[in-house]
Amino acid sequence: MNKVITDLDKALSALKDGDTILVGGFGLCGIPEYAIDYIYKKGIKDLIVVSNNCGVDDFGLGILLEKKQIKKIIASYVGENKIFESQMLNGEIEVVLTPQGTLAENLHAGGAGIPAYYTPTGVGTLIAQGKESREFNGKEYILERAITGDYGLIKAYKSDTLGNLVFRKTARNFNPLCAMAAKICVAEVEEIVPAGELDPDEIHLPGIYVQHIYKGEKFEKRIEKITTRSTK
């Protein structure tokens, strides 16, 4: 089955207000630039977003904050966005800060069909408030629940026409997990090859988790902070 599309509208036309989207990336590395721009232009709002971060003021998920399209964000780091900070302090957006490893495992559990699991991370902190706790072998654990979403929006380096994906280095990050935990996964890629051309050993995410593949013409790939030094 050829999963390649040339128009994101074919994959995202059913995305509606109030849906939950799982967005890959770490900072600005490996983010689905085209899908985010599509949502921004369509004005889809009241979204529940699950992502490592919320982009920067004018790029990534940050552009969805400009028109207040995000109702709730579940993330592990949100410190690079002034618009986000303002909306959070003014009570305009619901924020669920989650330890990074816990966020990854919540998505993994969702993709694996595991409804909940116990972890020691967050015990004795604000993270544990309102959560069930139990003791195992003399150590306290809190119950974390799996995360699933309506759409997984991810970015990969290469795909074959069946949706088998290859990521590049750190750009892999949360992308495979967002694909696994979503009902529908839309993968943006830089290169598409015929089915059978990828060595099975180099495939990072099997095509069973991917419903649509979109080849971007050019990815901006911004850097959050550029640090330079004098040539002297």
From Swiss-Prot:
Residues reported to bind CoA: 24-30
Pfam families associated with the record: CoA_trans (PF01144)
Gene Ontology MF: a single term: succinyl-CoA:3-oxo-acid CoA-transferase activity
E.C. number: 2.8.3.5
Keyword Transferase in record: yes
Record's keyword terms, sorted: Transferase
Domain of life: Bacteria
Catalytic activities: a 3-oxo acid + succinyl-CoA = a 3-oxoacyl-CoA + succinate
Family: Belongs to the 3-oxoacid CoA-transferase subunit A family.
Subunit details: Heterodimer of a subunit A and a subunit B.
Protein name: Succinyl-CoA:3-ketoacid coenzyme A transferase subunit A
Originating organism: Helicobacter pylori (strain ATCC 700392 / 26695)
Gene: scoA
